Amino acid sequence: MAVPKRKMSRSNTRARRSQWKAEAPTLVKTIENGKVVYSMPHRARVVEDAAGTPLYMEYKGRKVADV
């Protein structure tokens, strides 16, 4: 196992850790039933009826799963 030669200072430790940050997800704007909906690209979406009841999941215009 690798062992550091010298103790790493608090500022250097924090500077290194500051590079580990989460990115905001990429969202795609679509219009469904007259409403603007933001969703993640390349994901199956849930198709709902007018009452909001989930019917099935769809990907690239094809039904892929029942909900």
UniProtKB/Swiss-Prot annotation:
Pfam families: Ribosomal_L32p. InterPro entries: Ribosomal_bL32, Ribosomal_zn-bd. Residues 1-19 have a biased composition (Basic residues). One of its GO terms (biological process) is translation. Coiled coil: none annotated. One of its GO terms (cellular component) is large ribosomal subunit. Residues 1-21 are annotated as: Disordered. This is Large ribosomal subunit protein bL32. It comes from the Bacteria. The keyword Ribosomal protein applies. The gene is rpmF. The keyword Repressor does not apply. Keywords: Ribonucleoprotein, Ribosomal protein. GO terms for molecular function: structural constituent of ribosome. Belongs to the bacterial ribosomal protein bL32 family. It comes from Clavibacter michiganensis subsp. michiganensis (strain NCPPB 382).
